[in-house]
UniProtKB/Swiss-Prot annotation:
Protein's organism: Clostridium botulinum (strain Hall / ATCC 3502 / NCTC 13319 / Type A)
Required cofactor names: pyridoxal 5'-phosphate
EC number: 2.9.1.1
Annotated GO biological process: conversion of seryl-tRNAsec to selenocys-tRNAsec; selenocysteine incorporation
Encoding gene, per UniProt annotation: selA
Predominant location category: cytoplasm
Molecular-function annotations in GO: L-seryl-tRNA(Sec) selenium transferase activity
GO cellular component, one term: cytoplasm
Name of the featured protein: L-seryl-tRNA(Sec) selenium transferase
Lineage: Bacteria, Bacillati, Bacillota, Clostridia, Eubacteriales
Reactions listed under catalytic activity: L-seryl-tRNA(Sec) + selenophosphate + H(+) = L-selenocysteinyl-tRNA(Sec) + phosphate
Modified sites of kind N6-(pyridoxal phosphate)lysine: 293
Location of the protein in the cell: Cytoplasm
Keywords (A to Z) from UniProt: Cytoplasm, Protein biosynthesis, Pyridoxal phosphate, Selenium, Transferase
Similarity comment text for this entry: Belongs to the SelA family.
Annotated function: Converts seryl-tRNA(Sec) to selenocysteinyl-tRNA(Sec) required for selenoprotein biosynthesis.
Amino acid sequence: MDKKQLLRNLPKIDELLKEEIVNRYLQENSRTLVVDSLRQSIDYYRGEILKNNIDSFTKENVVNYFIDTLEENKSTKFKKVINATGVVIHTNLGRSLLAKEAIENVVKVSENYSNLEYDLKEGKRGSRYSHVEELIKKVTGAEAAMVVNNNAAAVMLALNTLCEEREAIVSRGQLVEIGGSFRVPDVMKFSRAHLVEVGTTNRTHLYDYENNINENTGVLLKVHTSNFKIMGFTEEVSSEEMVQLGGKYKLPVMEDIGSGTLVDFSKYGFTYEPTVQSSLEKGVDVVTFSGDKMLGGPQAGIIVGKKKYIDKMKKNQLTRALRIDKMTLAALEGTLKCYIDEKEAIENIPTLNMILSSKDIHKKRAQRLKRRLQNNVKDFNFKVSEDLSMVGGGSMPGERIPTYVVKVNSDKITAEKIEEKLRLSKNPIIVRVSKDEVILDVRTLFERDFNIIVEEFKKLLK
Protein backbone atom coordinates (compact mmCIF):
# COMPACT_ATOMS: atom_id res chain seq x y z
CA MET A 1 0.00 0.00 0.00
CA ASP A 2 1.37 3.44 -0.90
CA LYS A 3 2.11 6.15 1.66
CA LYS A 4 -0.85 8.36 0.72
CA GLN A 5 -3.31 5.51 1.12
CA LEU A 6 -1.82 4.57 4.50
CA LEU A 7 -2.21 8.16 5.70
CA ARG A 8 -5.83 8.22 4.49
CA ASN A 9 -6.47 4.99 6.42
CA LEU A 10 -5.45 6.49 9.75
CA PRO A 11 -8.58 6.44 11.97
CA LYS A 12 -10.10 9.67 13.27
CA ILE A 13 -10.33 10.30 17.02
CA ASP A 14 -14.16 10.32 16.92
CA GLU A 15 -14.07 6.95 15.20
CA LEU A 16 -11.74 5.47 17.84
CA LEU A 17 -13.88 6.84 20.67
CA LYS A 18 -16.68 4.56 19.49
CA GLU A 19 -14.55 1.46 19.96
CA GLU A 20 -15.76 -0.61 22.94
CA ILE A 21 -12.32 -0.92 24.55
CA VAL A 22 -11.63 2.82 24.19
CA ASN A 23 -15.05 3.55 25.66
CA ARG A 24 -14.14 1.45 28.71
CA TYR A 25 -11.03 3.55 29.27
CA LEU A 26 -13.16 6.66 28.82
CA GLN A 27 -15.37 5.61 31.72
CA GLU A 28 -12.35 5.12 34.00
CA ASN A 29 -10.29 8.15 32.96
CA SER A 30 -10.80 11.79 32.03
CA ARG A 31 -11.84 12.54 28.44
CA THR A 32 -8.82 14.85 28.06
CA LEU A 33 -6.40 12.06 28.99
CA VAL A 34 -8.06 9.56 26.64
CA VAL A 35 -8.22 11.99 23.69
CA ASP A 36 -4.60 13.09 24.20
CA SER A 37 -3.47 9.45 24.28
CA LEU A 38 -5.45 8.65 21.12
CA ARG A 39 -3.91 11.64 19.38
CA GLN A 40 -0.42 10.48 20.39
CA SER A 41 -1.16 7.01 19.00
CA ILE A 42 -2.36 8.40 15.66
CA ASP A 43 0.62 10.77 15.51
CA TYR A 44 2.98 7.87 16.15
CA TYR A 45 1.61 5.86 13.21
CA ARG A 46 1.58 8.96 10.98
CA GLY A 47 5.27 9.49 11.78
CA GLU A 48 6.12 5.84 11.08
CA ILE A 49 4.33 6.03 7.71
CA LEU A 50 6.13 9.23 6.70
CA LYS A 51 9.48 7.65 7.64
CA ASN A 52 8.62 4.57 5.53
CA ASN A 53 8.98 2.34 8.60
CA ILE A 54 5.67 0.50 8.06
CA ASP A 55 3.72 -0.63 5.01
CA SER A 56 0.56 -1.70 6.82
CA PHE A 57 -1.31 -1.36 10.11
CA THR A 58 -4.72 -2.09 11.58
CA LYS A 59 -7.10 -0.16 13.77
CA GLU A 60 -6.29 -2.72 16.48
CA ASN A 61 -2.60 -1.71 16.26
CA VAL A 62 -3.55 1.93 16.86
CA VAL A 63 -5.79 1.02 19.80
CA ASN A 64 -3.11 -1.17 21.41
CA TYR A 65 -0.59 1.65 21.11
CA PHE A 66 -3.20 3.97 22.66
CA ILE A 67 -3.54 1.64 25.68
CA ASP A 68 0.22 1.60 26.28
CA THR A 69 0.38 5.38 25.82
CA LEU A 70 -2.49 5.97 28.23
CA GLU A 71 -0.83 3.88 30.94
CA GLU A 72 2.44 5.72 30.38
CA ASN A 73 0.68 9.10 30.59
CA LYS A 74 -0.99 8.07 33.86
CA SER A 75 2.26 6.99 35.48
CA THR A 76 4.53 9.48 37.22
CA LYS A 77 7.68 10.51 35.37
CA PHE A 78 9.72 10.65 38.58
CA LYS A 79 10.22 6.95 39.32
CA LYS A 80 11.83 4.69 41.83
CA VAL A 81 14.72 2.79 40.25
CA ILE A 82 16.82 -0.08 41.54
CA ASN A 83 20.52 0.76 41.59
CA ALA A 84 22.59 -2.34 40.82
CA THR A 85 25.61 -0.37 39.58
CA GLY A 86 27.59 -0.39 42.82
CA VAL A 87 27.96 3.40 42.64
CA VAL A 88 26.76 4.45 46.09
CA ILE A 89 26.25 8.20 45.57
CA HIS A 90 24.98 7.93 42.01
CA THR A 91 24.55 11.49 40.72
CA ASN A 92 22.05 10.51 38.03
CA LEU A 93 20.02 8.26 40.34
CA GLY A 94 19.36 10.81 43.07
CA ARG A 95 22.61 10.71 45.05
CA SER A 96 22.18 9.83 48.73
CA LEU A 97 19.24 7.86 50.11
CA LEU A 98 17.67 9.26 53.25
CA ALA A 99 17.77 7.69 56.69
CA LYS A 100 14.46 6.41 58.06
CA GLU A 101 14.41 9.20 60.67
CA ALA A 102 14.84 11.82 57.93
CA ILE A 103 11.99 10.34 55.85
CA GLU A 104 9.64 10.24 58.85
CA ASN A 105 10.48 13.86 59.64
CA VAL A 106 9.69 14.92 56.05
CA VAL A 107 6.31 13.14 56.11
CA LYS A 108 5.42 14.69 59.46
CA VAL A 109 6.04 18.30 58.42
CA SER A 110 4.66 17.82 54.90
CA GLU A 111 1.23 16.48 55.83
CA ASN A 112 0.75 18.99 58.66
CA TYR A 113 1.27 22.66 59.33
CA SER A 114 4.65 23.30 60.93
CA ASN A 115 6.65 25.90 62.85
CA LEU A 116 8.80 26.59 59.78
CA GLU A 117 9.12 30.31 60.54
CA TYR A 118 7.29 30.53 63.85
CA ASP A 119 8.86 30.71 67.29
CA LEU A 120 6.54 28.63 69.48
CA LYS A 121 8.22 29.81 72.68
CA GLU A 122 7.88 33.52 71.90
CA GLY A 123 4.68 33.31 69.87
CA LYS A 124 6.06 35.34 66.98
CA ARG A 125 7.86 35.03 63.64
CA GLY A 126 11.01 32.93 63.82
CA SER A 127 13.84 31.83 61.53
CA ARG A 128 13.74 28.70 59.38
CA TYR A 129 17.47 28.23 59.98
CA SER A 130 16.97 27.81 63.74
CA HIS A 131 15.66 24.26 63.25
CA VAL A 132 19.03 22.93 62.11
CA GLU A 133 21.59 25.54 63.17
CA GLU A 134 22.10 24.19 66.68
CA LEU A 135 22.36 20.62 65.37
CA ILE A 136 24.94 21.62 62.75
CA LYS A 137 26.94 23.49 65.39
CA LYS A 138 26.80 20.48 67.68
CA VAL A 139 28.05 17.93 65.14
CA THR A 140 30.68 20.19 63.50
CA GLY A 141 31.89 22.37 66.37
CA ALA A 142 31.13 25.55 64.40
CA GLU A 143 30.29 28.92 65.96
CA ALA A 144 27.39 29.42 63.56
CA ALA A 145 25.70 27.77 60.60
CA MET A 146 23.11 28.26 57.89
CA VAL A 147 21.73 26.26 54.98
CA VAL A 148 20.84 27.10 51.37
CA ASN A 149 19.54 24.93 48.54
CA ASN A 150 22.83 23.45 47.25
CA ASN A 151 26.58 23.78 47.63
CA ALA A 152 27.08 25.93 44.51
CA ALA A 153 24.60 28.36 46.08
CA ALA A 154 26.50 28.18 49.37
CA VAL A 155 29.77 29.08 47.64
CA MET A 156 28.11 31.90 45.69
CA LEU A 157 26.43 33.38 48.78
CA ALA A 158 29.60 33.18 50.87
CA LEU A 159 31.74 34.82 48.18
CA ASN A 160 29.15 37.51 47.48
CA THR A 161 29.01 38.34 51.19
CA LEU A 162 32.75 38.28 51.84
CA CYS A 163 34.07 39.44 48.52
CA GLU A 164 31.62 41.35 46.31
CA GLU A 165 33.56 43.43 43.77
CA ARG A 166 36.77 42.38 45.49
CA GLU A 167 39.37 39.73 44.74
CA ALA A 168 39.25 36.08 45.78
CA ILE A 169 42.63 34.38 45.56
CA VAL A 170 42.53 30.67 44.66
CA SER A 171 45.00 28.08 43.41
CA ARG A 172 44.80 27.37 39.67
CA GLY A 173 44.77 23.64 40.43
CA GLN A 174 41.56 24.02 42.47
CA LEU A 175 39.37 25.61 39.79
CA VAL A 176 37.25 22.49 39.49
CA GLU A 177 34.23 21.65 37.36
CA ILE A 178 31.59 20.20 39.65
CA GLY A 179 29.50 18.48 36.98
CA GLY A 180 26.93 19.53 34.42
CA SER A 181 29.43 22.14 33.13
CA PHE A 182 29.18 24.13 36.37
CA ARG A 183 32.62 25.44 37.20
CA VAL A 184 34.05 27.21 40.24
CA PRO A 185 35.19 30.22 38.13
CA ASP A 186 31.63 30.61 36.80
CA VAL A 187 30.11 30.42 40.28
CA MET A 188 32.63 33.05 41.40
CA LYS A 189 31.70 35.27 38.46
CA PHE A 190 28.01 35.23 39.41
CA SER A 191 28.93 35.98 43.02
CA ARG A 192 30.60 39.19 41.73
CA ALA A 193 33.89 38.20 43.29
CA HIS A 194 36.92 38.78 41.06
CA LEU A 195 38.94 35.62 40.51
CA VAL A 196 42.69 35.77 41.00
CA GLU A 197 44.36 32.51 39.96
CA VAL A 198 47.72 31.73 41.53
CA GLY A 199 50.29 28.95 41.19
CA THR A 200 50.15 26.23 38.56
CA THR A 201 47.88 23.25 37.96
CA ASN A 202 50.06 20.88 39.99
CA ARG A 203 52.01 23.16 42.37
CA THR A 204 50.96 26.17 44.40
CA HIS A 205 53.03 27.69 47.22
CA LEU A 206 52.20 30.03 50.09
CA TYR A 207 54.14 32.85 48.43
CA ASP A 208 51.85 32.57 45.39
CA TYR A 209 48.98 33.70 47.59
CA GLU A 210 50.96 36.30 49.52
CA ASN A 211 52.45 37.91 46.41
CA ASN A 212 48.94 38.58 45.09
CA ILE A 213 47.43 40.11 48.23
CA ASN A 214 46.58 43.80 47.84
CA GLU A 215 44.15 46.40 49.19
CA ASN A 216 41.36 44.93 47.02
CA THR A 217 41.74 41.33 48.27
CA GLY A 218 38.56 40.09 49.94
CA VAL A 219 39.15 36.42 50.73
CA LEU A 220 41.64 33.56 50.49
CA LEU A 221 39.80 30.62 48.96
CA LYS A 222 40.66 26.93 49.14
CA VAL A 223 38.64 24.40 47.12
CA HIS A 224 38.94 20.71 47.91
CA THR A 225 39.31 18.73 44.69
CA SER A 226 36.85 16.06 45.79
CA ASN A 227 36.09 14.78 42.29
CA PHE A 228 39.64 14.30 40.95
CA LYS A 229 43.17 13.75 42.19
CA ILE A 230 46.51 15.03 40.90
CA MET A 231 49.35 12.61 41.54
CA GLY A 232 53.13 12.95 41.30
CA PHE A 233 55.01 16.26 41.40
CA THR A 234 52.49 18.28 43.40
CA GLU A 235 52.36 20.90 46.11
CA GLU A 236 49.46 22.66 47.78
CA VAL A 237 49.12 25.06 50.67
CA SER A 238 47.59 23.59 53.82
CA SER A 239 44.57 25.07 55.56
CA GLU A 240 46.74 25.93 58.57
CA GLU A 241 49.16 27.92 56.41
CA MET A 242 46.32 29.79 54.74
CA VAL A 243 44.78 30.63 58.12
CA GLN A 244 48.12 32.04 59.31
CA LEU A 245 48.42 34.09 56.12
CA GLY A 246 44.83 35.32 56.45
CA GLY A 247 45.50 36.34 60.05
CA LYS A 248 48.63 38.24 59.01
CA TYR A 249 46.68 40.36 56.51
CA LYS A 250 43.32 40.32 58.37
CA LEU A 251 41.62 38.40 55.56
CA PRO A 252 38.97 35.69 55.97
CA VAL A 253 39.84 32.19 54.77
CA MET A 254 37.09 30.20 53.09
CA GLU A 255 37.20 26.51 52.21
CA ASP A 256 34.78 24.64 49.97
CA ILE A 257 35.16 20.97 50.81
CA GLY A 258 32.49 19.93 48.30
CA SER A 259 31.24 16.46 49.18
CA GLY A 260 31.56 17.32 52.86
CA THR A 261 32.03 14.45 55.27
CA LEU A 262 31.58 14.48 59.04
CA VAL A 263 33.18 11.03 59.34
CA ASP A 264 36.93 10.44 59.12
CA PHE A 265 36.92 7.60 56.61
CA SER A 266 40.64 6.96 57.08
CA LYS A 267 39.68 5.22 60.37
CA TYR A 268 37.94 2.61 58.24
CA GLY A 269 40.73 1.98 55.75
CA PHE A 270 39.96 4.65 53.16
CA THR A 271 42.19 7.43 51.88
CA TYR A 272 41.88 10.50 54.12
CA GLU A 273 39.30 13.07 53.07
CA PRO A 274 39.15 16.38 54.97
CA THR A 275 36.25 16.52 57.40
CA VAL A 276 34.21 19.62 58.17
CA GLN A 277 35.37 19.44 61.78
CA SER A 278 39.07 19.32 60.84
CA SER A 279 38.77 22.43 58.64
CA LEU A 280 37.10 24.36 61.46
CA GLU A 281 39.65 23.13 64.00
CA LYS A 282 42.42 24.50 61.78
CA GLY A 283 40.84 27.94 62.03
CA VAL A 284 39.15 28.25 58.63
CA ASP A 285 36.63 31.11 58.87
CA VAL A 286 33.94 29.78 56.51
CA VAL A 287 33.43 26.20 55.29
CA THR A 288 30.88 25.14 52.67
CA PHE A 289 29.77 21.60 51.78
CA SER A 290 26.97 19.51 50.28
CA GLY A 291 24.16 17.80 52.15
CA ASP A 292 23.42 15.00 49.68
CA LYS A 293 26.84 13.47 49.15
CA MET A 294 29.05 12.07 51.93
CA LEU A 295 26.73 13.53 54.57
CA GLY A 296 23.98 11.22 53.31
CA GLY A 297 21.15 13.74 53.50
CA PRO A 298 19.02 15.85 51.14
CA GLN A 299 20.35 18.28 48.56
CA ALA A 300 21.52 21.33 50.48
CA GLY A 301 24.43 23.71 50.75
CA ILE A 302 25.65 23.98 54.33
CA ILE A 303 27.71 26.95 55.49
CA VAL A 304 29.53 26.84 58.83
CA GLY A 305 32.11 29.05 60.48
CA LYS A 306 32.64 32.27 62.37
CA LYS A 307 29.42 33.88 63.61
CA LYS A 308 30.29 37.36 62.31
CA TYR A 309 30.49 36.06 58.74
CA ILE A 310 27.46 33.75 58.93
CA ASP A 311 25.33 36.58 60.36
CA LYS A 312 26.25 38.75 57.36
CA MET A 313 25.22 35.97 54.98
CA LYS A 314 21.84 35.61 56.67
CA LYS A 315 21.18 39.30 55.94
CA ASN A 316 22.33 39.09 52.32
CA GLN A 317 19.44 39.62 49.87
CA LEU A 318 20.59 36.56 47.91
CA THR A 319 19.71 34.37 50.88
CA ARG A 320 15.98 34.56 50.18
CA ALA A 321 16.49 33.48 46.57
CA LEU A 322 18.65 30.56 47.68
CA ARG A 323 16.74 29.54 50.78
CA ILE A 324 15.93 25.96 51.67
CA ASP A 325 12.36 24.59 51.80
CA LYS A 326 10.58 22.91 54.71
CA MET A 327 10.88 19.34 53.38
CA THR A 328 14.63 19.66 52.89
CA LEU A 329 15.00 21.19 56.34
CA ALA A 330 13.06 18.29 57.84
CA ALA A 331 15.20 15.74 56.00
CA LEU A 332 18.40 17.51 57.01
CA GLU A 333 17.34 17.67 60.66
CA GLY A 334 16.58 13.94 60.67
CA THR A 335 19.95 13.19 59.06
CA LEU A 336 21.96 15.39 61.42
CA LYS A 337 20.35 13.83 64.50
CA CYS A 338 21.95 10.53 63.50
CA TYR A 339 25.39 12.18 63.68
CA ILE A 340 25.15 12.83 67.41
CA ASP A 341 26.52 9.28 67.67
CA GLU A 342 28.86 8.24 64.82
CA LYS A 343 28.04 4.57 65.29
CA GLU A 344 24.34 5.35 64.91
CA ALA A 345 25.06 7.44 61.81
CA ILE A 346 26.94 4.57 60.13
CA GLU A 347 24.18 2.14 61.03
CA ASN A 348 21.20 4.28 59.99
CA ILE A 349 22.35 6.51 57.11
CA PRO A 350 22.23 4.38 53.93
CA THR A 351 25.13 6.16 52.21
CA LEU A 352 27.50 5.56 55.13
CA ASN A 353 26.25 2.02 55.64
CA MET A 354 26.75 1.09 51.98
CA ILE A 355 30.25 2.58 51.84
CA LEU A 356 31.45 1.03 55.10
CA SER A 357 29.71 -2.36 55.07
CA SER A 358 32.18 -5.24 54.76
CA LYS A 359 32.88 -7.31 51.67
CA ASP A 360 31.98 -10.51 53.56
CA ILE A 361 28.42 -9.28 54.16
CA HIS A 362 28.01 -8.66 50.44
CA LYS A 363 29.40 -12.08 49.54
CA LYS A 364 26.54 -13.71 51.45
CA ARG A 365 24.02 -11.32 49.89
CA ALA A 366 25.33 -11.98 46.37
CA GLN A 367 25.04 -15.72 46.98
CA ARG A 368 21.42 -15.29 48.13
CA LEU A 369 20.55 -13.26 45.04
CA LYS A 370 22.25 -15.80 42.77
CA ARG A 371 20.28 -18.69 44.37
CA ARG A 372 16.98 -16.88 43.90
CA LEU A 373 17.75 -16.13 40.26
CA GLN A 374 18.94 -19.68 39.52
CA ASN A 375 15.89 -21.22 41.17
CA ASN A 376 13.40 -19.06 39.29
CA VAL A 377 14.90 -17.97 35.95
CA LYS A 378 15.73 -20.30 33.04
CA ASP A 379 18.16 -19.85 30.12
CA PHE A 380 20.55 -17.58 32.01
CA ASN A 381 23.93 -18.22 33.63
CA PHE A 382 24.57 -16.69 37.05
CA LYS A 383 27.82 -16.57 39.00
CA VAL A 384 29.13 -14.71 42.05
CA SER A 385 32.40 -12.83 41.59
CA GLU A 386 34.59 -10.36 43.42
CA ASP A 387 34.48 -6.84 42.01
CA LEU A 388 34.86 -3.18 42.98
CA SER A 389 32.18 -0.64 43.93
CA MET A 390 32.56 3.14 43.76
CA VAL A 391 31.65 5.91 46.19
CA GLY A 392 30.51 8.24 43.38
CA GLY A 393 28.99 11.71 43.65
CA GLY A 394 32.32 13.40 42.96
CA SER A 395 33.66 11.99 46.23
CA MET A 396 36.82 10.02 47.06
CA PRO A 397 38.31 10.08 43.54
CA GLY A 398 40.11 6.86 42.65
CA GLU A 399 38.76 5.02 45.70
CA ARG A 400 37.36 1.57 44.99
CA ILE A 401 35.52 -0.63 47.49
CA PRO A 402 35.94 -4.44 47.34
CA THR A 403 32.55 -6.06 46.84
CA TYR A 404 30.76 -9.10 45.47
CA VAL A 405 28.52 -9.09 42.41
CA VAL A 406 26.27 -11.43 40.48
CA LYS A 407 27.37 -11.72 36.84
CA VAL A 408 24.76 -12.71 34.26
CA ASN A 409 24.88 -13.88 30.65
CA SER A 410 22.72 -15.89 28.25
CA ASP A 411 23.04 -17.57 24.87
CA LYS A 412 19.58 -16.27 23.96
CA ILE A 413 19.99 -12.53 24.60
CA THR A 414 22.95 -10.14 24.61
CA ALA A 415 24.15 -8.33 27.72
CA GLU A 416 23.35 -5.00 26.05
CA LYS A 417 19.77 -6.12 25.39
CA ILE A 418 19.40 -7.36 28.99
CA GLU A 419 20.59 -3.96 30.23
CA GLU A 420 18.12 -2.15 27.98
CA LYS A 421 15.15 -4.32 28.94
CA LEU A 422 15.89 -4.03 32.67
CA ARG A 423 16.26 -0.26 32.34
CA LEU A 424 12.94 0.05 30.48
CA SER A 425 11.03 -2.41 32.66
CA LYS A 426 8.06 -1.55 34.88
CA ASN A 427 10.49 -1.54 37.82
CA PRO A 428 13.60 0.04 36.23
CA ILE A 429 16.83 -1.73 37.19
CA ILE A 430 20.10 0.03 36.37
CA VAL A 431 23.06 -2.33 35.92
CA ARG A 432 26.63 -2.37 34.64
CA VAL A 433 27.75 -4.23 31.51
CA SER A 434 31.30 -5.51 31.10
CA LYS A 435 32.78 -8.14 28.77
CA ASP A 436 29.38 -9.37 27.56
CA GLU A 437 28.10 -9.82 31.11
CA VAL A 438 25.49 -7.94 33.10
CA ILE A 439 26.76 -7.07 36.57
CA LEU A 440 24.51 -6.74 39.62
CA ASP A 441 26.47 -5.18 42.49
CA VAL A 442 24.67 -6.02 45.73
CA ARG A 443 26.38 -3.20 47.66
CA THR A 444 23.75 -0.77 46.36
CA LEU A 445 20.84 -3.21 46.52
CA PHE A 446 18.38 -3.75 49.35
CA GLU A 447 16.95 -7.16 50.26
CA ARG A 448 13.56 -5.84 49.13
CA ASP A 449 15.01 -5.41 45.62
CA PHE A 450 15.84 -9.10 45.18
CA ASN A 451 12.29 -10.31 44.47
CA ILE A 452 11.73 -7.49 41.98
CA ILE A 453 14.97 -8.36 40.17
CA VAL A 454 13.91 -12.00 39.93
CA GLU A 455 10.47 -11.06 38.56
CA GLU A 456 11.93 -8.72 35.93
CA PHE A 457 14.46 -11.36 34.82
CA LYS A 458 11.59 -13.81 34.32
CA LYS A 459 10.09 -11.44 31.72
CA LEU A 460 13.27 -10.86 29.71
CA LEU A 461 12.78 -13.68 27.18
CA LYS A 462 9.01 -13.34 26.82
